[in-house]
Amino acid sequence: HIWNEAAAAVTYEIYASQYAALGKKQEAGAFKRAAHLALRSIGRWIREDGSGFIVKNRFPIEVMHGYESYSAQSQYNLLACWLMCVAYLYADNSIKESPSPSDIGGYVLVMKDVFHKVFANSGGNYVEYELSGDPRYNATGLIRIHLKNSNPQLGPSDGIPHKWDNKKKQDLGGELYAVGPEWHDAAGGVYRLAEYTNILFPDTSYFSAYKGSKLPEIDVRNVRQSVDGVAFEVVYTGRFDGVTQISQRVYIDHTGITVRDILKGNVKKVRACYPMLIDDGMEETKIDFQDGKVILQSRDGQICFQAISPPNATIQRKRKRIPYRNGYADIAYFESDKNVIQYKITTEF
């Protein structure tokens, strides 16, 4: 919902003013910059009548696409407006902007125990990794990629969760997808890391594809943090339908996001899956398949999903139309008969 950015703007303006009062100009400027970035994000979601798209898609209000049961055009516009007014009241426009952490990056923030997330940023290129998805809201794996100077919704900006009826508290099923591995076994079974939700703090009332008698181990390793680039590796060890270990190595620098997936086990082939926004409710994404890559273009940005290993891989699409918060998605993929697969998401192509 767009009120999240409005709430962030309030927090950042308060901190900017407090740091300025302490004479800490650089910190104050960083929070001022962050407040402006939050408000700029809201500016992407203004309707022709001046109200906001409360969820980040452009479907008509009456469709309620991507809404929660408690979402409504009225109260969430009012909440966002009220929060922006509060931000205005706290704002000190004598504070000059300085770079914020989201501009510079150089960090990997591991929040395993409570939020089961990893956040990482290098030079404004950013990812969110969901270590153990709640299937009502998130798949497991790499669910969000935002690249500097691109359309954030193309990232993708969200994974694909199950459809959930909040009023009846009922899981309506569906397909779970994130950026990451899918594997096929000799018997024809198809499995994805994204499906192994609800595995860190399991709740038996929620879906998980994991059937092992012992919970898997989830480790975040090989964290690297520098101004030039950041990296981390997520390793799952357990019983994943023929696979005993899944590793995703994520490297971020100014050129984009590079991912290497390694599976240990008896698999017939491995695919790298990439959820593509194909329709935001008002505009369909332009999709261009070229040798070893697919280029997406929508509104003010482009992004490229590119196969690195195996070389000469062909990128295909599943030709699905899966509803999720940002609109409808299809899945781009390429495959390998090896247990290692590598790819890149970039704006440089």
Language-model-detected regions and their locations in the chain:
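Catalytic and substrate-binding regions of extracellular carbohydrate-active enzymes
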Residues: 72-75, 85-272
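Intrinsic-disorder/low-complexity loop/linker signature
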Residues: 93, 169, 175, 188, ...
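Generic recognition of long tandem-repeat/solenoid scaffolds
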Residues: 118-122, 230-236, 287, 293-298, ...
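A short beta-strand/turn structural motif
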Residues: 270-292
